[in-house]
Structures are given as structure tokens and as C-alpha cells.
From Swiss-Prot:
Xref: Gene3D superfamilies: Rhodopsin 7-helix transmembrane proteins
Function: Odorant receptor.
Protein family according to the UniProt entry: Belongs to the G-protein coupled receptor 1 family.
GO MF entries: G protein-coupled receptor activity; olfactory receptor activity
Alphabetical keyword list: Cell membrane, Disulfide bond, G-protein coupled receptor, Glycoprotein, Membrane, Olfaction, Receptor, Sensory transduction, Transducer, Transmembrane, Transmembrane helix
Topological domains, Cytoplasmic: 47-54, 121-139, 218-237, 293-309
GO annotation, cellular component aspect: plasma membrane
Protein name per Swiss-Prot or TrEMBL: Olfactory receptor 8U1
Subcellular location, principal: membrane
Organism: Homo sapiens (Human)
Coiled coil: none
Glycoprotein recorded as keyword: yes
Disulfide bonds: 97-189
């Protein structure tokens, strides 16, 4: 391949969600409110689980880690996105862009794998209740969280290094509100075929394997629930798993739409709307999904409020 002489970009300009000035301030207020709700909801859930001894179980250990990932996930993206509404040009340095992409990928992959760990936890709890505390020991729980974090960090690091070893000389204007792969690849003057193949392969393998764990776990769970003689037991099992199923459907559904589609149909404006959903909306929704239908969380919150009063 012939060498292309070009000046390497040292910074990028994030276009943001809209160019319409009249929309920027209302959107700033809206997304700031959502972000504050996300921070309060997720950190509040973590503190509640830590404060109430009745919630010191494997299920809530995983839930507190999911809340932590959601908090970090949103915090990597939203503050910079809010800057898009306040500044004429939202500039991000080359290194900061790489850091944002790496952190974003770390927490996105972590969330995907944590949802699979939580599905396995629910499988053991419902299908083998007598062995639950024997199987889900503190050591096993830590491993089911540590492995996703470690794997996610290594994958994100390799992925980010591949992206930022490319030459960026066509333009430095990123048609997005954060540093993401597809908008960045459109700016490079390097051959991106290997990189695009890597994105598709990694996303496909990770999503399919984690979804397979979730699917198989829930096949056994549903089978076990249908065999229960107690209507109350069935209702409790369904309510416990229903929250997780809803969170899984929303998260994986959005990511499949985003990453497992042909590049020819990869419209960046459509991707921006999907990205808002899974980087801003989902981290806000998860505390609500897992709390509103959970009697134990609501009881723990009531106890804290009563004790303070």
C-alpha cells in the first residue's frame, strides 16, 4: 500500500446531537436532569445495599456492581455531551478521545457480561434453591464479577489501541456526541477492513455468548417456575426474574441494533439516537427497573427513612 502523507489530528470536534441553537438549552436541561437522576439512583442503590444487612446476598452483590457500572457508563459520556449544548465547538484532545472510547467500551462490555452473571445467579437460586448458598459462595461471586471487569478492560484496551493507531487526516470533525468507533473510522485515511472485521467479530462473539448464557438460564428458570405448585412461589419467582429480563431485553436489543448491522445501513444520525438510549436512558432506567418491583429493596428503603425520622 502506498504511504499517504498527511497531518495527524491532535484533537477532534464533537458535532453533538443537534445544530439548532434553540434546542440546545432545553436539551441541556433535560439531559442534566436525567444524569442527576442516574447518579442519585445508582449511587443510592449501592449505598442502600451496603447499609441494609438483609440485602447482603449474591443477588444484590451483582445488582450493586451493575449499578456501579451504570453510574460509570453514564459518567464517561454524559458530561462531555452536556458540553455540546454549551459551547460552539466541543473540542476533545486525541488522548482524551482515546480515554473516553476505552472507558466506554470497558463499561459497555462489563454490563453485558454482568447481565449474564446475574442470569446464572437467578438460575441457581430458582432451579437449585437448597444449594444456592453452597454454590454462590463469596469467592464465586467475586470471580463472576472480577472476570467481566478484567476481560472488559483488556478487550477495550486492545480495541482502543487498534483504533488510535490509525491515521486521522481527512477531517477532525466527529459526527457524534462522544468518541465512538464508527464515526472515527469515517475520518481515517488508513485501511479499516481489519478493524471493522474485528468490531463485528468481537461484538458478535461477546453478545452471542452472553446472550446464550442468559437464554439457557431462563429456559431452565421458566421450566422450574412452571413446575412450582405454589402460586405465590411462581409469582415471587417471576417478579424477581422479570426485572432482569426487562433490563436484558432493553440493553441487548439496543446493542444488536447498533453493532450487528451491515456498514452500508449504518446511518450515523440513527446511531446517535440509539446511543442516547443506551448511554443515557438505560443507566437511568435500571435502578427503577430493579427497585420498583422489588419488595426487599422497598422495605429496606422504608426502614432507612423510618430510622432517620
Amino acid at each position: 500500500m502506498a504511504h499517504i502523507n498527511c497531518t495527524q489530528a491532535t484533537e477532534f470536534i464533537l458535532v453533538g446531537l443537534t445544530d439548532h441553537q434553540e434546542l440546545k438549552m432545553p436539551l441541556f436541561v433535560l439531559f442534566l436532569s436525567i444524569y442527576l437522576f442516574t447518579v442519585v439512583g445508582n449511587l443510592g442503590l449501592i449505598l442502600l445495599i451496603r447499609a441494609d444487612t438483609s440485602l447482603n446476598t449474591p443477588m444484590y452483590f451483582f445488582l450493586s456492581n451493575l449499578a456501579f457500572v451504570d453510574f460509570c457508563y453514564s459518567s464517561v459520556i454524559t458530561p462531555k455531551m452536556l458540553g455540546n449544548f454549551l459551547y460552539k465547538q466541543n473540542v476533545i484532545s486525541f488522548d482524551a478521545c482515546a480515554t473516553q472510547l476505552g472507558c466506554f467500551l470497558t463499561f459497555m462490555i462489563s454490563e453485558s457480561l454482568l447481565l449474564a452473571s446475574m442470569a446464572y445467579d437467578r438460575y441457581v437460586a430458582i432451579c437449585n434453591p437448597l444449594l444456592y448458598m453452597v454454590v454462590m459462595t463469596p469467592g464465586i461471586c467475586i470471580q463472576l464479577v472480577a472476570v467481566p471487569y478484567s476481560y472488559s478492560f483488556l478487550m477495550a484496551l486492545f480495541h482502543t489501541i487498534l483504533t488510535f493507531r490509525l491515521s486521522y487526516c481527512h477531517s477532525n470533525i466527529v459526527n457524534h456526541f462522544y468518541c465512538d468507533d464508527m464515526p472515527l473510522l469515517r475520518l481515517t485515511c488508513s485501511d479499516t477492513r481489519f478493524k471493522q472485521l474485528w468490531i463485528f467479530a468481537c461484538a458478535g462473539i461477546m453478545f452471542i455468548s452472553s446472550l446464550l448464557i442468559v437464554f439457557v438460564s431462563y429456559m431452565f428458570i421458566i421450566s422450574a417456575i412452571l413446575r412450582m405448585h405454589s402460586a405465590e412461589g411462581r409469582q415471587k419467582a417471576f417478579s424477581t426474574c422479570g426485572s432482569h429480563m426487562l433490563a436484558v431485553t432493553i440493553f441487548y436489543g439496543t446493542l444488536i441494533f447498533m453493532y450487528l448491522q451491515p456498514s452500508s445501513s449504518h446511518a450515523l444520525d440513527t446511531d446517535k439516537m440509539a446511543s442516547v438510549f443506551y448511554t443515557v436512558i438505560i443507566p437511568m432506567l435500571n435502578p427503577l427497573i430493579y427497585s420498583l418491583q422489588n419488595k426487599e429493596v422497598k422495605e429496606a428503603l422504608k426502614k432507612i427513612i423510618i430510622n432517620k425520622n
